[in-house]
A protein has these predicted regions:
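Conserved acidic segment of CheY-like receiver
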Residues: 9-20, 25-29, 58
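Short acidic, S/G/P-rich loop/turn micro-motifs used as interaction or catalytic elements
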Residues: 18-22, 63-68, 96, 116
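Acidic, metal-coordinating helix/loop segments flanking the phosphotransfer/catalytic sites
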Residues: 41-57, 63-65
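Conserved phosphotransfer cores of two-component systems
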Residues: 51-53, 79-85, 105
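Conserved phosphotransfer microenvironments
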Residues: 59-78
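Alpha4 helix (beta4-alpha4-beta5 surface) of REC/receiver domains from two-component response regulators
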Residues: 70, 94-111, 115
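A short, hydrophobic beta-strand element within the central beta-sheet of small alpha/beta folds
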Residues: 85-96
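C-terminal output helix
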Residues: 115-125
């Protein structure tokens, strides 16, 4: 019998969600995927975690919980860093115009919190988390 190959769960970095929203995100993701979800709150801890870990996906809230600043600023910093620029990033927002703006900055098309549990959202995440 061939040795069993251990499959490592994918890592997701969730940025800028308050405690209750982070909990909802973790439940949604772990229900649908074998993944570990870490939390960051702003640019400094986000970049530090990304440089120290291997993340399959970064989910950035459109408005950060710590100071209500624009999450697209973190997206810009990730995409400007040669070591991180290929890391897939999605903006979490229910507003199509903000999804469009994030895509123009190099993000993958994200989803909003109202879309948790939607089969289309799960399908969108599969290419990063399966």
């Amino acid at each position: 019998m061939a040795p069993r190959k251990e499959v490592m769960s994918k890592r997701v970095l969730d940025v800028g969600n308050c405690g209750p929203d982070f909990g909802s995100m973790v439940r949604f993701l772990t229900k649908n995927f074998d993944c570990q979800v870490d939390q960051a709150h702003g640019p400094e801890d986000t970049l530090e975690k990304l440089r120290g870990g291997d993340y399959a996906l970064v989910l950035v809230n459109r408005k950060l919980d710590q100071d209500y600043s624009d999450g697209s600023e973190i997206l810009k910093q990730i995409k400007a860093d040669p070591a991180l620029q290929n890391t897939p990033v999605m903006i979490i927002t229910n507003h199509a115009e903000h999804q469009d703006a994030a895509e123009a900055l190099g993000a993958e098309r994200g989803f909003g919190k109202l879309e948790f549990g939607d089969p289309a959202t799960v399908e969108k995440l599969e290419k990063f988390l399966r």
